[in-house]
Amino acid sequence: MRSAKKLLSVLCLGVFILTFTACDMVEKTPEAKAKSTIAKVNGEKIQRKDLDENPRFKQVVSQMKMQYGEEFEKSEQGKEVIKEQKSQILDELITEKVLLQKGKELKVIPKDEELNKEADKKVNEIKAVYNNDEKKFEETLKSTGFTKETLKEYLKDQIVIEKVINEATKGVKVEDKDAQKYYNENQSMFTEKPNTMNVSHILVKTEDEAKKVKKRLDAKEDFAKVAKEVSQDGSKDKGGLLGDISYSDSNLDPTFLKAAIALKEGAISNPVHTQFGYHIIKINSKKEYPVKKFDAVKEDIKKQLKQEKQQEAYTKKIEEWKKASKIKIYEKNLL
């Protein structure tokens, strides 16, 4: 009797294992994959189709295929890139879900009629960009992964999100004294015309090399000649000449730019350390213009500072909201 019970138990266990394994081995249908849950935010599901049909994700896939070929998604490298992109966009979808939930909580969601009206207005604004050419508008929608319906739904969500962000940042203020401080510290940004300087430099790897270069230049050796001999930058063939540079050039290393601005016309710097190595900088000439009066730029400065503070406040608030939310991600369902 005991043997029979044991056998029955083993058989039942075997059936369970086989059933479980079989279920795990059965490939999901495209419909089932589309409906599979990839994340939950406070109990609300984000499904695989929300990600796969997301216009941002579609654009990424389209760009990858154009660059690497139609089979890119099937390669190991392609799968890794797709997974990484999906994770990034999923994080954006989670953020949007948190914001939309907050919209309900804060009671800032307009009534359906008003929301549809606002969304239609935004659609018409987009159409106006294409001179109300319906064909061009539809071609652009298709190329960006939208349909008319999904665009409108997207815009409705963005309207709600904008209202939530406004609510979260409504306490942000910028005083005149904040603008005055920024103006005093960044006067080169507020000139009648952009200040520029004509710059040459010599780039070497170590500080010792830079000191040797400076010593040669202090001994009145020709800057261009020394640059051609020792510089490790592409500008060496031009004697280290970089040409005219704006004081607000965001493409330059900030440390390099700050050191160059501080030099007088004709001056040569001591070694300046940046991420690229050690530079010796020479200012060949400068064009500096009068600074605008504070009152003429005050409102622009306040607007800029307010936007920056609002961004900081929003980032802090969304991190706080996400931390307080119950968020679960189902990684295995992403691919």
Curated annotation (Swiss-Prot):
Catalyzed reactions: [protein]-peptidylproline (omega=180) = [protein]-peptidylproline (omega=0)
InterPro entries in the record, alphabetically? Foldase_PrsA, PPIase_dom_sf, PPIase_PpiC, PPIase_PpiC_CS, PrsA_foldase, Trigger_fact/SurA_dom_sf
Key words of the record = Cell membrane, Isomerase, Lipoprotein, Membrane, Palmitate, Rotamase, Signal
- Record-stated family: Belongs to the PrsA family.
Lipid tethering residues (S-diacylglycerol cysteine): C23
- Domain of life of the source: Bacteria
EC number per UniProt: 5.2.1.8
User: What biological processes does GO assign it?
Assistant: protein folding
Give GO cellular component annotations, separated by semicolons.
plasma membrane
Q: Where is the signal peptide?
A: 1-22
Q: Where is the lipid attached (N-palmitoyl cysteine)?
A: C23
The protein here is known as Foldase protein PrsA
Per UniProt, residues of the PpiC domain are 194-285
Q: Does the keyword Isomerase apply?
A: yes
EC top class named in words: isomerase
UniProt subcellular location: Cell membrane
Q: How does it sit in the membrane?
A: Lipid-anchor
The GO terms this record gives for MF are: peptidyl-prolyl cis-trans isomerase activity
